[in-house]
Regions:
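Conserved GNAT acetyl-CoA-binding A-motif
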Residues: 62-73
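Acetyl-CoA-dependent GNAT
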Residues: 1-43, 129-130, 140-143
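Residue-level signal for beta-strand positions within conserved beta-sheet cores that form or flank
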Residues: 31, 68, 121
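Conserved beta-strand-loop-alpha-helix junction that forms the acyl-donor binding cleft
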Residues: 71-82, 98-103
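Conserved acetyl-CoA-binding loop-helix of GNAT-fold acetyltransferases
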Residues: 40, 46-61, 83-87
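C-terminal "cap" of GNAT-fold acetyltransferases
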Residues: 98-144
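Conserved acetyl-CoA-binding loop of GNAT-fold acetyltransferases
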Residues: 86-96
Length: 144
């Protein structure tokens, strides 16, 4: 149990679950909220539904709270997700180096102090309230 996280299921227009999106750290701080666990589980689902759901969730966060920015972290090799986040106006802030460790088939990533032995990076991206709402027409005209 983690009281600082909330997970939402995303359904298509036929009430079929196609993925999930979440919030983290929103109960700890009112200035910055993490968009978390963004997954489109059904690869056959209509393209763009997770993007629209994420846009609406971010809108709700900004309307319902005094939060000025939302952020997320994504693996640097997840080009599809990064493209989606850029279309939602998230900007790259920094990259954190990670070392991949495999133990008995379980993969875990460890943060590194330097880039020297990094296997991959965690991209930290942010979206400001004003940038989000300026993007409304682009998102609403999106047809997947």
């Amino acid at each position: 149990k983690n009281d600082s996280k909330v997970l939402f299921l995303v359904f298509d227009n036929h009430d079929v679950p196609i993925g999930h999106i979440g919030l983290a750290d929103g109960l700890i701080t009112d200035s910055l909220v993490e968009m978390d666990n963004i997954v489109r589980g059904d690869k056959t689902a209509q393209k763009g539904l997770i993007s629209l759901a994420l846009y609406e969730l971010i809108s709700w966060v900004f309307i319902s709270t005094s939060c000025k920015k939302v952020y997320l972290r994504v693996f640097s090799d997840n080009f599809k997700a990064i493209s989606i986040y850029e279309n939602l106006q998230f900007t790259h802030i920094n990259k954190e180096p990670l070392k991949k460790n495999v133990n008995e088939g379980v993969i875990k990533y460890e943060f590194l102090e330097s880039n020297k032995n990094a296997d991959i990076y965690f991209c930290y991206m942010e979206l400001a309230r004003n940038d989000h709402f300026k993007n409304y027409e682009n998102i609403k005209n999106f047809n997947g």
